[in-house]
Amino acid sequence: IIDVVSIWKINDEKLLLICNTKNKNLLIEWIDKFTFDEEIHLKESNNYELIHTFTDSRTINFENFDLAGSNIKQFSDQFESFFISKTSFFNQHETVDFLFDKELSEEVNNILLSQDFKELNNDKFLSFKIKNIIPYGQNEFNLSFNPLELNLIHLIDFEKGCYIGQEVIARLDTYDKVQKKLIMLNKINSADLINSSGSQITSEDKDNCMIIVRKKFINL
């Protein structure tokens, strides 16, 4: 995996690719390398901020807000360059994401907090991510793992187009040859599995860890 990105179609002429900051340079290199006849121009931007809003539930249902599917809505009555979309983390845990100009950061944060949104610090979000087995960031998205090991089969299109690694991933899936899997373990109760051959912790907090383990060592 080079990275997993979200694409925001702002208009017919402009797409925003949201990527992991630490994977940015490698991602740009690969896009440039495999862009041939298409008229695509990449411009790096650090002008936007992205906020995920979510609940403990995996699904979000709206009663008074029309945001179907993953359509992007733009709000320009109060803020300029403010976009909102219903989407999900990479484990399909649904979120509502806000994308906006960084100059609005303090104002947007204050509005959300005034509406009883709770802000998670890095440690709390890390624990949430581990508990829900959400691959997120360079620890999971790197050249050491393939999408099937990270439970990302829902992001793979086995029919559309022709892309690097497509044939390898298709064979792994068709013949059930994926040997590893990303799971969550309690660090105290699972010492043997954590220390088993081929296991690799990707993220951890005080009590639990998200770890790649060989499937033969777990009951599936």
Protein language model regions, located:
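Glycine-rich, small/acidic residue-mixed loop/short-helix segments
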Residues: 1, 5, 122, 126-128, ...
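Acidic, low-complexity central loop/insert segments
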Residues: 6-135
